[in-house]
Protein backbone atom coordinates (compact mmCIF):
# COMPACT_ATOMS: atom_id res chain seq x y z
CA UNK A 1 0.00 0.00 0.00
CA UNK A 2 1.29 3.48 -0.91
CA UNK A 3 1.22 6.12 1.80
CA UNK A 4 1.28 9.90 1.35
CA UNK A 5 4.66 11.44 2.08
CA UNK A 6 3.53 12.89 5.42
CA UNK A 7 2.17 9.56 6.59
CA UNK A 8 5.30 7.71 5.44
CA UNK A 9 7.41 10.17 7.43
CA UNK A 10 5.22 9.77 10.50
CA UNK A 11 5.45 5.98 10.24
CA UNK A 12 9.26 6.06 9.95
CA UNK A 13 9.47 8.54 12.80
CA UNK A 14 7.28 6.32 15.02
CA UNK A 15 9.31 3.26 14.06
CA UNK A 16 12.59 4.99 14.90
CA UNK A 17 11.28 6.17 18.24
CA UNK A 18 10.03 2.66 19.02
CA UNK A 19 13.45 1.18 18.35
CA UNK A 20 15.10 3.80 20.54
CA UNK A 21 12.59 3.20 23.35
CA UNK A 22 13.13 -0.54 23.12
CA UNK A 23 16.89 -0.01 23.31
CA UNK A 24 16.54 2.21 26.37
CA UNK A 25 14.24 -0.30 28.05
CA UNK A 26 16.88 -2.98 27.52
CA UNK A 27 19.35 -0.83 29.45
CA UNK A 28 17.09 -0.66 32.49
CA UNK A 29 17.70 -3.10 35.38
CA UNK A 30 15.59 -6.23 35.06
CA UNK A 31 13.71 -7.12 38.26
CA UNK A 32 14.66 -10.49 39.71
CA UNK A 33 11.49 -12.54 40.07
CA UNK A 34 13.24 -15.46 41.75
CA UNK A 35 10.00 -17.40 42.16
CA UNK A 36 9.54 -17.57 38.38
CA UNK A 37 13.13 -18.51 37.65
CA UNK A 38 13.51 -21.19 40.30
CA UNK A 39 13.70 -24.85 39.46
CA UNK A 40 11.42 -27.06 41.56
CA UNK A 41 13.01 -30.21 42.95
CA UNK A 42 11.34 -32.84 45.11
CA UNK A 43 13.27 -34.17 48.10
CA UNK A 44 12.31 -37.00 50.46
CA UNK A 45 13.12 -36.89 54.17
CA UNK A 46 12.54 -40.03 56.27
CA UNK A 47 11.90 -38.37 59.63
CA UNK A 48 11.61 -35.10 61.50
CA UNK A 49 14.73 -34.87 63.62
CA UNK A 50 17.72 -32.66 64.19
CA UNK A 51 19.79 -35.29 62.44
CA UNK A 52 19.02 -33.25 59.31
CA UNK A 53 20.39 -30.07 60.90
CA UNK A 54 22.12 -28.85 57.74
CA UNK A 55 18.92 -29.26 55.74
CA UNK A 56 16.91 -27.27 58.28
CA UNK A 57 19.58 -24.55 58.30
CA UNK A 58 19.58 -24.39 54.50
CA UNK A 59 15.80 -24.00 54.46
CA UNK A 60 15.70 -21.43 57.27
CA UNK A 61 18.47 -19.31 55.77
CA UNK A 62 17.10 -19.39 52.23
CA UNK A 63 20.12 -21.13 50.71
CA UNK A 64 18.09 -23.23 48.27
CA UNK A 65 16.37 -20.11 46.95
CA UNK A 66 19.78 -18.46 46.58
CA UNK A 67 20.77 -21.36 44.33
CA UNK A 68 17.62 -20.93 42.24
CA UNK A 69 15.98 -24.01 43.76
CA UNK A 70 12.37 -24.23 44.91
CA UNK A 71 12.50 -27.15 47.34
CA UNK A 72 9.46 -29.38 47.72
CA UNK A 73 10.14 -31.46 50.83
CA UNK A 74 8.20 -34.65 51.46
CA UNK A 75 8.34 -36.59 54.75
CA UNK A 76 8.32 -40.30 53.86
CA UNK A 77 8.66 -42.59 56.89
CA UNK A 78 9.29 -46.29 57.38
CA UNK A 79 12.16 -46.57 54.92
CA UNK A 80 9.81 -45.68 52.07
CA UNK A 81 12.04 -42.74 51.16
CA UNK A 82 14.36 -45.20 49.40
CA UNK A 83 11.46 -46.58 47.39
CA UNK A 84 10.50 -43.01 46.49
CA UNK A 85 13.94 -42.13 45.15
CA UNK A 86 14.29 -45.42 43.26
CA UNK A 87 10.89 -45.02 41.61
CA UNK A 88 11.58 -41.44 40.58
CA UNK A 89 8.79 -40.00 42.75
CA UNK A 90 11.41 -37.65 44.18
CA UNK A 91 14.65 -36.26 42.77
CA UNK A 92 16.71 -36.26 45.98
CA UNK A 93 16.62 -38.11 49.28
CA UNK A 94 18.27 -37.15 52.55
CA UNK A 95 18.64 -40.57 54.07
CA UNK A 96 20.82 -42.81 56.17
CA UNK A 97 23.93 -44.35 54.69
CA UNK A 98 22.18 -47.59 55.60
CA UNK A 99 19.47 -46.73 53.08
CA UNK A 100 22.12 -46.54 50.39
CA UNK A 101 23.38 -49.96 51.50
CA UNK A 102 19.90 -51.48 51.56
CA UNK A 103 19.30 -50.33 48.00
CA UNK A 104 22.65 -51.79 46.94
CA UNK A 105 21.89 -55.10 48.66
CA UNK A 106 18.57 -55.17 46.82
CA UNK A 107 20.29 -54.76 43.47
CA UNK A 108 19.80 -51.02 42.94
CA UNK A 109 22.67 -48.55 42.85
CA UNK A 110 21.99 -45.06 44.14
CA UNK A 111 24.59 -42.30 44.29
CA UNK A 112 25.59 -40.50 47.47
CA UNK A 113 26.57 -36.92 46.61
CA UNK A 114 26.90 -35.23 50.00
CA UNK A 115 27.99 -36.30 53.49
CA UNK A 116 25.37 -34.89 55.85
CA UNK A 117 26.57 -36.33 59.18
CA UNK A 118 29.87 -38.01 59.97
CA UNK A 119 29.07 -39.79 63.25
CA UNK A 120 26.40 -42.00 64.81
CA UNK A 121 23.68 -39.87 66.38
CA UNK A 122 21.19 -42.58 67.39
CA UNK A 123 20.89 -42.75 71.16
CA UNK A 124 19.14 -45.36 73.29
CA UNK A 125 17.20 -44.29 76.38
CA UNK A 126 15.64 -46.75 78.84
CA UNK A 127 12.67 -46.29 81.18
CA UNK A 128 13.77 -45.49 84.71
CA UNK A 129 11.76 -48.31 86.28
CA UNK A 130 13.06 -50.82 83.71
CA UNK A 131 16.64 -49.75 84.36
CA UNK A 132 16.10 -50.08 88.11
CA UNK A 133 14.54 -53.53 87.72
CA UNK A 134 17.45 -54.73 85.56
CA UNK A 135 20.11 -53.10 87.73
CA UNK A 136 21.32 -50.79 84.97
CA UNK A 137 23.10 -47.59 86.01
CA UNK A 138 24.85 -44.85 83.99
CA UNK A 139 28.11 -45.65 85.78
CA UNK A 140 28.30 -49.12 84.17
CA UNK A 141 30.35 -49.73 81.03
CA UNK A 142 28.11 -49.80 77.95
CA UNK A 143 28.66 -53.54 77.23
CA UNK A 144 27.53 -54.39 80.77
CA UNK A 145 24.40 -52.25 80.41
CA UNK A 146 23.52 -53.93 77.12
CA UNK A 147 23.94 -57.45 78.50
CA UNK A 148 21.17 -56.71 81.00
CA UNK A 149 18.44 -55.71 78.54
CA UNK A 150 17.25 -59.28 77.90
CA UNK A 151 13.46 -59.44 77.86
CA UNK A 152 12.94 -55.79 76.98
CA UNK A 153 11.05 -54.18 74.11
CA UNK A 154 12.86 -51.59 72.02
CA UNK A 155 10.99 -49.03 69.92
CA UNK A 156 13.19 -48.07 67.01
CA UNK A 157 12.02 -45.68 64.34
CA UNK A 158 9.32 -46.48 61.83
CA UNK A 159 10.39 -49.92 60.65
CA UNK A 160 13.11 -52.45 60.01
CA UNK A 161 14.43 -50.43 57.08
CA UNK A 162 15.48 -47.36 59.07
CA UNK A 163 18.84 -46.82 60.70
CA UNK A 164 17.63 -46.40 64.34
CA UNK A 165 16.26 -49.95 64.04
CA UNK A 166 19.53 -51.23 62.59
CA UNK A 167 21.61 -49.50 65.27
CA UNK A 168 19.47 -51.10 68.00
CA UNK A 169 19.72 -54.47 66.24
CA UNK A 170 23.51 -54.15 66.04
CA UNK A 171 23.86 -53.24 69.72
CA UNK A 172 21.69 -56.17 70.79
CA UNK A 173 23.86 -58.56 68.79
CA UNK A 174 27.02 -56.94 70.15
CA UNK A 175 25.74 -57.78 73.63
CA UNK A 176 25.50 -61.45 72.67
CA UNK A 177 21.70 -61.37 72.61
CA UNK A 178 19.40 -62.49 69.81
CA UNK A 179 16.95 -59.94 68.37
CA UNK A 180 13.46 -61.40 68.22
CA UNK A 181 14.28 -64.00 70.86
CA UNK A 182 16.02 -62.27 73.75
CA UNK A 183 14.96 -58.74 72.87
CA UNK A 184 11.98 -57.49 70.86
CA UNK A 185 12.66 -54.64 68.44
CA UNK A 186 9.64 -53.03 66.86
CA UNK A 187 8.58 -49.92 65.00
CA UNK A 188 7.27 -47.19 67.28
CA UNK A 189 6.60 -44.54 64.64
CA UNK A 190 7.87 -40.99 64.81
CA UNK A 191 9.72 -39.57 67.76
CA UNK A 192 6.64 -38.07 69.41
CA UNK A 193 4.85 -41.43 69.21
CA UNK A 194 7.85 -43.17 70.72
CA UNK A 195 7.89 -40.74 73.63
CA UNK A 196 4.27 -41.63 74.40
CA UNK A 197 5.00 -45.36 74.04
CA UNK A 198 7.94 -45.07 76.43
CA UNK A 199 6.03 -43.02 78.97
CA UNK A 200 3.06 -45.42 78.97
CA UNK A 201 5.24 -48.54 79.18
CA UNK A 202 4.47 -49.96 75.75
CA UNK A 203 8.21 -49.99 75.10
CA UNK A 204 11.11 -50.18 77.55
CA UNK A 205 13.80 -48.60 75.39
CA UNK A 206 13.78 -46.11 72.53
CA UNK A 207 16.39 -45.92 69.76
CA UNK A 208 16.06 -42.51 68.10
CA UNK A 209 18.01 -39.48 66.93
CA UNK A 210 17.89 -36.22 68.89
CA UNK A 211 15.95 -34.57 70.33
CA UNK A 212 13.67 -37.46 71.35
CA UNK A 213 15.86 -39.49 73.74
CA UNK A 214 16.95 -36.20 75.30
CA UNK A 215 13.31 -35.17 75.80
CA UNK A 216 12.52 -38.50 77.49
CA UNK A 217 15.44 -38.00 79.86
CA UNK A 218 14.54 -34.35 80.47
CA UNK A 219 10.94 -35.32 81.29
CA UNK A 220 12.16 -37.83 83.87
CA UNK A 221 10.80 -40.85 82.02
CA UNK A 222 14.17 -42.39 81.15
CA UNK A 223 17.90 -42.51 81.65
CA UNK A 224 20.55 -42.90 78.99
CA UNK A 225 21.35 -46.46 77.92
CA UNK A 226 23.80 -45.71 75.10
CA UNK A 227 24.73 -42.14 74.16
CA UNK A 228 26.19 -42.54 70.69
CA UNK A 229 26.02 -38.78 70.23
CA UNK A 230 28.74 -38.64 72.89
CA UNK A 231 30.75 -41.50 71.40
CA UNK A 232 29.99 -43.88 74.28
CA UNK A 233 30.26 -47.04 72.19
CA UNK A 234 33.55 -47.04 70.30
CA UNK A 235 32.59 -49.52 67.51
CA UNK A 236 30.11 -46.89 66.30
CA UNK A 237 32.50 -43.94 66.45
CA UNK A 238 33.49 -44.26 62.76
CA UNK A 239 30.01 -44.05 61.33
CA UNK A 240 28.87 -41.76 58.51
CA UNK A 241 25.22 -41.60 59.49
CA UNK A 242 23.53 -39.89 56.58
CA UNK A 243 23.94 -38.83 52.98
CA UNK A 244 22.14 -36.97 50.23
CA UNK A 245 21.40 -39.43 47.42
CA UNK A 246 20.16 -39.25 43.85
CA UNK A 247 19.65 -41.73 41.05
CA UNK A 248 22.86 -42.02 38.98
CA UNK A 249 21.01 -41.31 35.74
CA UNK A 250 19.43 -38.19 37.27
CA UNK A 251 22.85 -36.90 38.32
CA UNK A 252 24.20 -37.50 34.83
CA UNK A 253 21.37 -35.63 33.12
CA UNK A 254 21.03 -32.85 35.71
CA UNK A 255 24.59 -32.07 36.77
CA UNK A 256 23.89 -28.37 37.34
CA UNK A 257 20.80 -29.04 39.46
CA UNK A 258 22.63 -31.53 41.66
CA UNK A 259 25.53 -29.09 42.05
CA UNK A 260 23.15 -26.33 43.14
CA UNK A 261 21.36 -28.50 45.71
CA UNK A 262 24.71 -29.73 47.04
CA UNK A 263 25.93 -26.13 47.10
CA UNK A 264 23.02 -25.10 49.33
CA UNK A 265 23.70 -28.01 51.69
CA UNK A 266 27.42 -27.25 51.82
CA UNK A 267 26.78 -23.61 52.61
CA UNK A 268 24.42 -24.65 55.41
CA UNK A 269 26.91 -27.14 56.87
CA UNK A 270 29.61 -24.46 56.95
CA UNK A 271 27.19 -22.07 58.61
CA UNK A 272 26.29 -24.65 61.28
CA UNK A 273 29.96 -25.43 61.94
CA UNK A 274 30.99 -21.77 62.13
CA UNK A 275 28.15 -20.41 64.27
CA UNK A 276 27.43 -20.70 67.96
CA UNK A 277 25.01 -23.46 68.97
CA UNK A 278 22.64 -20.86 70.44
CA UNK A 279 22.38 -19.08 67.09
CA UNK A 280 21.87 -22.36 65.23
CA UNK A 281 19.17 -23.47 67.68
CA UNK A 282 17.43 -20.10 67.35
CA UNK A 283 17.33 -20.35 63.55
CA UNK A 284 15.99 -23.93 63.35
CA UNK A 285 13.62 -23.64 66.33
CA UNK A 286 10.61 -22.95 64.08
CA UNK A 287 10.83 -26.53 62.81
CA UNK A 288 10.75 -27.97 66.37
CA UNK A 289 8.06 -26.00 68.17
CA UNK A 290 7.32 -28.85 70.62
CA UNK A 291 10.93 -29.19 71.79
CA UNK A 292 11.78 -27.35 75.03
CA UNK A 293 14.35 -24.61 74.26
CA UNK A 294 16.97 -26.07 76.61
CA UNK A 295 16.59 -29.53 75.07
CA UNK A 296 16.78 -28.07 71.57
CA UNK A 297 19.97 -26.21 72.45
CA UNK A 298 21.63 -29.22 74.08
CA UNK A 299 20.67 -31.35 71.07
CA UNK A 300 22.19 -28.87 68.63
CA UNK A 301 25.34 -28.95 70.75
CA UNK A 302 25.40 -32.74 70.33
CA UNK A 303 24.76 -32.65 66.58
CA UNK A 304 27.13 -29.83 65.61
CA UNK A 305 30.34 -31.91 65.91
CA UNK A 306 28.84 -34.50 63.54
CA UNK A 307 28.20 -31.95 60.78
CA UNK A 308 30.85 -32.17 58.06
CA UNK A 309 31.62 -28.57 56.96
CA UNK A 310 32.68 -29.48 53.42
CA UNK A 311 30.39 -32.49 52.95
CA UNK A 312 33.16 -34.78 51.74
CA UNK A 313 32.63 -38.53 52.00
CA UNK A 314 34.64 -40.44 54.62
CA UNK A 315 35.68 -43.94 53.59
CA UNK A 316 36.27 -44.93 57.23
CA UNK A 317 32.81 -43.66 58.18
CA UNK A 318 31.18 -45.46 55.26
CA UNK A 319 32.91 -48.71 56.16
CA UNK A 320 31.77 -48.28 59.77
CA UNK A 321 28.15 -48.35 58.62
CA UNK A 322 28.92 -51.24 56.30
CA UNK A 323 30.32 -53.28 59.19
CA UNK A 324 27.21 -52.74 61.33
CA UNK A 325 24.95 -53.76 58.45
CA UNK A 326 27.13 -56.78 57.73
CA UNK A 327 26.80 -57.93 61.37
CA UNK A 328 23.04 -57.47 61.02
CA UNK A 329 22.98 -59.63 57.90
CA UNK A 330 21.81 -56.84 55.59
CA UNK A 331 25.05 -56.63 53.61
CA UNK A 332 26.51 -59.89 52.34
CA UNK A 333 28.76 -58.85 49.44
CA UNK A 334 31.65 -56.37 49.04
CA UNK A 335 30.51 -52.77 48.77
CA UNK A 336 32.06 -50.75 45.88
CA UNK A 337 32.06 -47.38 47.64
CA UNK A 338 33.89 -45.70 44.76
CA UNK A 339 30.84 -46.53 42.65
CA UNK A 340 28.18 -45.61 45.23
CA UNK A 341 29.44 -42.21 46.43
CA UNK A 342 31.17 -39.23 44.86
CA UNK A 343 32.58 -35.81 45.78
CA UNK A 344 32.14 -34.60 42.20
CA UNK A 345 29.32 -32.15 42.94
CA UNK A 346 30.92 -30.39 45.92
CA UNK A 347 31.69 -26.67 45.51
CA UNK A 348 35.19 -26.11 44.23
Give, region by region, the residue ranges found by the protein language model:
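Small-molecule pocket liners
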Residues: 53, 118-124, 128-130, 222-223, ...
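Short, glycine-/small- and polar/acidic-enriched structural segments
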Residues: 37-180, 185-188, 204-210, 227
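Pocket-lining segment of extracytoplasmic ligand-binding domains
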Residues: 193-286
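Secondary-structure end/capping motifs
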Residues: 252-330
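Conserved C-terminal helix/tail region of periplasmic/extracytoplasmic solute-binding proteins
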Residues: 322-348
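Short, solvent-exposed loop/beta-turn-alpha elements that line the ligand-binding surface or hinge
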Residues: 66, 131-137, 231-237, 304-314
Amino acid sequence: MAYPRSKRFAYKSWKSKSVICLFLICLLPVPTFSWSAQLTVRMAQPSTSLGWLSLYAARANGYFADEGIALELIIVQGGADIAAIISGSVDFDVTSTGGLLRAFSGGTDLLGVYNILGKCIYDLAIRKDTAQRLGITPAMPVPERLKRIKGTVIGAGSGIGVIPYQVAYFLVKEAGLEPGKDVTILAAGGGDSALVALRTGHIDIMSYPPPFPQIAIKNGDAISLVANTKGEYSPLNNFQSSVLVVRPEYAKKNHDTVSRVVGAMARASRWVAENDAKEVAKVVAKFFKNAPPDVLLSTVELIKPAVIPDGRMSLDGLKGVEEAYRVNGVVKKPVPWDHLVTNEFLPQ
